[in-house]
């Protein structure tokens, strides 16, 4: 079973949704960007991340634009379910840009990152360095198309922060603003076969028939396939090492000096 929700901005009250009570071990909640729970590196924040990582289901997110990329990039990268992820804590992971996964028996193409609406207001060189990290690199764009092509340009679900350019007019009527990520996702739209595309950023919940969903604070079931109940993996106890008994000292005959 896979559920999807939108921008969190560090607000974990979304996890109280009754929908999530249906999720089992091996299922997943996917967040479409602006996770925002990796922000200042405080002890409280680390406790929150540990708590989310202890959920029985997988908590997965693509990055948006309101993230602390310096902190996020410190987490280790590892292969998981077919694609690269950043392991945050336990069952909490970042799905990386342009990666392809098999999650809860469904295929998912993920593409996080975007262009902040505040970019034009940055004045300091350091600010520019920060927002550049929001943007996908040419290598990530190319890798995304290559990964899709490797899987016959087919996925059950596409998860992105930005919408494809063609969807913007259905969300913001009269808006002509586009960026190169929107245009790139249009290319994905033209080549990929998929069941549903979820994206965030716009802070509204809106279905664009037949296969596109702009999502914000709703928690929706993308796939309700019930996986068999999985047993919690048992912690392996370290094997006890048997202590060797010391050899018994032999007595010597006082007269001969020989050992008895």
What are these regions (language model features)?
Residues 1-3, 99-110, 157, 209-213:
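Beta-strand-turn-beta hairpins that frame and shape the catalytic cleft
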Residues 5, 10-103, 174, 181-185, ...:
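Core catalytic region of metal-dependent phosphoesterases/phosphodiesterases
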Residues 9-10, 36-38, 66-68, 113-117, ...:
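Short, solvent-exposed loop/turn segments at secondary-structure junctions
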Residues 43, 73-75, 120-123, 170-172, ...:
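Short aromatic-enriched loop/helix-cap "lid" or pocket-rim segments at secondary-structure transitions
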Residues 90, 104-176:
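Active-site-proximal loop/helix segment associated with metal-binding centers of metalloenzymes
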Residues 97, 113, 128, 217-219:
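Active-site donor-binding loop signature of nucleotide-sugar glycosyltransferases
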Residues 102, 186-191, 202-260:
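Binuclear metal-dependent phosphoesterase catalytic core
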Residues 155, 159-160, 193-194, 198-199:
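Proline-aspartate-enriched helix->loop->beta-strand connector
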């Amino acid at each position: 079973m896979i559920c999807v929700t939108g921008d969190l901005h560090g607000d974990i009250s979304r996890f109280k949704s009754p929908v999530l009570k249906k999720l089992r071990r091996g299922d997943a909640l996917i967040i479409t960007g602006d996770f925002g729970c990796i922000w200042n590196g405080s002890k409280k924040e680390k406790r929150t991340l540990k708590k989310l990582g202890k959920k029985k289901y997988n908590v997965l997110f693509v990055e948006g634009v309101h993230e602390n990329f310096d902190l996020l990039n410190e987490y280790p990268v590892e292969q998981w379910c077919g694609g690269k992820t950043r392991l945050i804590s336990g069952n909490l992971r970042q799905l990386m840009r342009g990666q392809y996964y098999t999650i809860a028996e469904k295929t998912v193409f993920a593409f996080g990152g975007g262009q902040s609406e505040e970019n034009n207001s940055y004045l300091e060189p350091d600010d520019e360095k920060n927002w550049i990290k929001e943007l996908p690199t040419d290598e990530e764009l190319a890798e995304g198309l290559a990964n899709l092509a490797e899987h016959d340009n087919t996925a059950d679900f596409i998860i992105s922060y930005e919408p494809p350019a063609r969807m913007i007019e259905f969300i913001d009527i009269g808006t002509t603003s586009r960026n190169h990520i929107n245009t790139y996702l249009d290319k994905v739209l033209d080549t990929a076969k998929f069941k549903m595309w979820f994206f965030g950023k716009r802070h509204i919940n809106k279905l664009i028939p037949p296969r596109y969903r702009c999502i914000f604070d709703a928690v929706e079931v993308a796939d309700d396939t019930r996986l068999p109940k999985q047993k919690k993996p048992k912690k392996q106890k370290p094997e006890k090492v048997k202590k060797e008994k010391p050899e018994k000292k032999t007595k010597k005959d006082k007269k001969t000096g020989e050992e008895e």
